Amino acid sequence: MSKQTDKTSQIVLSTPLSILSGGGEPICSLATQPSGAIGVIRVSGEKAIEVTDKVFHGVRGKHLTDAKGNTLHYGEILDKEGKTIDDVLVSVFRAPHSYTGENSTEISCHGSAYILNQVVKALIDAGCRQAQPGEYTQRAYMNGKMDLSQAEAVADLIAASNRATHQVALSQLKGHFSSELSLLREQLLKMTSLLELELDFSDHEELEFADRTELKALAETIHQKIKLLTDSFETGKALKKGVPVAIVGKTNVGKSTLLNCLLHEEKAIVSNIHGTTRDVIEDTTEIKGVTFRFIDTAGIRHTDDQIEKLGIERAYQKMDEAAIVLWVIDEQPTAEECTEMQRLAKGKHLIAIFNKIDSKEIERKLLNDELPTVFISAKLKQNITALEEAIYEAADIPEISENSVIITSARHYEALTHADESILRVIEALDFGLSGDLVSEDLRICLHQLADITGGQITPHEVLGNIFKHFCIGK
């Protein structure tokens, strides 16, 4: 067997665990927003139960230090002078059966900001320190309760603003993405071990443990799986930030009225005066659980007004940034106008919207076979449901469940892209019949890139800090 150690199968940290995780010292912080009916304060660390017990007075004198894990206890929290702060319920969790994998307590009390602050102060006086943003989840990662991609999913789950982002974050937190990476890693390790076995017996040129045809087929399978993941990133970005939809057209065709209609609120000023909208107006709304970011733009026309000209320039810019373009018209456009709009919206999903069907006689026909057309009255909110359906279909969002694996992180996308580049070099090397040591090197690079995502190899303190600093305090 190879004498080389597969470093990708180990977790090797460049910074000691005790520094990264605080050595298990007790930390505390609010886990809920203040001023609610109920507030929760989380405590975690090797001595978390002992520290909480110092400020807790249980009924009939019971001590938390004697309590079993996963139990609930009623009593009072006292300040350092022994005065009652509030009646509380304390949940006790013993390692490793807690969120962080450490001994933990959660104190439920009344949600007054004053009470919560006094309880935290009492805990700090008893030996806790204030937790840093994301420190609980960082400790959960360091203690093996979750991998790095799952830890990032916690932040995504908290930030989820619609059904789609919630499902994607939940899938990642449950480990579906990690499972995909684990399968890829197993296949890569199999290839690497066979090639390195050949290197150990390099004196026997007639020996070939790894069939090159089978290796290439496996490498191509890995490439296809990685490509499916990287291709999902565009969908992931759209789900997180909202699918950008530009509303364009001439002045006074009803673009602002349509925006207000889609948003279900009076966001844009509506007027019969040409050129009323001079700047870009943006807002979001949900259609079928997916967030869409609608962008109302200045009416496109020839003008000498310099401010209006700037607005029109921004309209073209926003059209270029959009995934979907809604072309609002209130009369039959010429063939030249259709061609020009299709040119401007090249690479986008373009939908023509005939507005004002309540006040104009319009020949209801498609502009051409390639251009979807919807007939509406934004003023009277007629056929808006049909328009929303057309917008949703244009977004081409796949059916999303809690088992869906969709990439939403730029960090994950970058690592997968580099991994794919490595596996493509493997395929090329096998095509040219290059030696096993060269092929093996690119396989190791691919493994390292995939392991970067889950934190299963060298992970500098700076990388962890950058990830966890975006969490809220209490997570």
Indicate where each model-derived feature is located.
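A glycine-rich (often HGG/GG-containing) alpha/beta subdomain
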Residues: 1-167, 171, 175, 351
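C-terminal-of-GTPase-core extension/linker across diverse P-loop GTPases
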Residues: 7-30, 163-286, 303-305, 334-475
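Conserved catalytic network of the ASCE P-loop NTPase/AAA+ motor domain
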Residues: 33-35, 83, 99, 239, ...
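Switch I (G2) and immediately adjacent beta-strands of P-loop GTPase domains
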Residues: 74-86, 90-94, 275-303, 321
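Short glycine-/small-residue-rich Rossmann-like dinucleotide-binding loops
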Residues: 263, 298-299, 323, 330-331, ...
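Generic enzyme active-site microenvironment
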Residues: 294, 328, 353
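Inter-motif core of Ras-like GTPase G domains
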Residues: 308-331
